UniProtKB/Swiss-Prot annotation:
Region (Putative zinc finger 2): 44-74
GO cellular component entries: nucleus
Protein name, per record: Protein LOL4
Cellular localisation: Nucleus
Residues covered by region (Putative zinc finger 1): 4-34
Stretches the record annotates as Putative zinc finger 3: 82-112
Length: 147
């Protein structure tokens, strides 16, 4: 199982295997100690105002982005999906339903393959047919939310 921490040298997000005492950043070679209790109490989300990855304590209800100053609600943080960049193999987070995700490391545009199809029900107002009967206008379809 893997986890993530922020490098104490360059502030990049670094992945590591759970159970290790320290992580060497591949970008700047800084050794960052792993604090198991702090990692277990942390969560992450992507800022709703910019593409910044934010880390916060699980008990927090809101977190302010240091990049764009937007206040983010942590209630929807569990609605994050992950994929691996097809070019540099970096783990990326994205909102469910996204059709593409651009990697912040190498700028490669990744197509989300597992965008789950969803059933959509559209109910328009009832109308009268040529005989004066009230008719329902309901359409059912399936979409993957790709635009």
């Amino acid at each position: 199982m893997q986890d993530q921490l922020i490098c104490s040298g360059c502030r990049r997000v670094v992945q590591y295997r759970r159970g290790v005492a320290g992580v060497c950043c591949p970008g700047c070679n800084t050794l960052t100690a792993v604090n198991p209790s702090a990692v277990a109490d942390m969560s992450e989300l992507i800022c709703s105002g910019c593409p910044t990855l934010l880390f916060y304590n699980r008990g927090a209800s809101n977190i302010r982005c240091p990049s764009c100053n937007r206040l983010n609600s942590t209630r929807s943080a569990n609605q994050i999906a992950h994929l691996t960049c097809g070019q540099c193999r970096t783990t990326l987070m994205h909102p469910p339903g996204a059709s593409t995700v651009q990697c912040a490391t190498c700028r490669y545009v990744n197509h989300v393959r597992d965008a789950r199809p969803q059933t959509v029900l559209v109910e328009n107002p009832k109308t009268l047919d040529d005989k004066g009967k009230l008719v329902s206008n309901v359409v059912v379809g399936v979409t993957s939310w790709k635009r």
